[in-house]
UniProtKB/Swiss-Prot annotation:
GO terms for cellular component: extracellular region. Keywords: Cleavage on pair of basic residues, Disulfide bond, Secreted, Toxin. Belongs to the conotoxin M superfamily. Signal peptide: none annotated. This is Conotoxin reg3l. The cysteine framework is III (CC-C-C-CC). The lineage of its organism: Eukaryota, Metazoa, Spiralia, Lophotrochozoa, Mollusca. The keyword RNA-binding does not apply.
Length: 19
């Protein structure tokens, strides 16, 4: 699951969001 962040897109890898 990816967390929604400003300037960050929710993708399959979610590089901006910590897992």
């Amino acid at each position: 699951r990816c967390c929604p962040m400003p300037g960050c897109f929710a993708g399959p890898f979610c590089p901006c969001c910590p897992v």
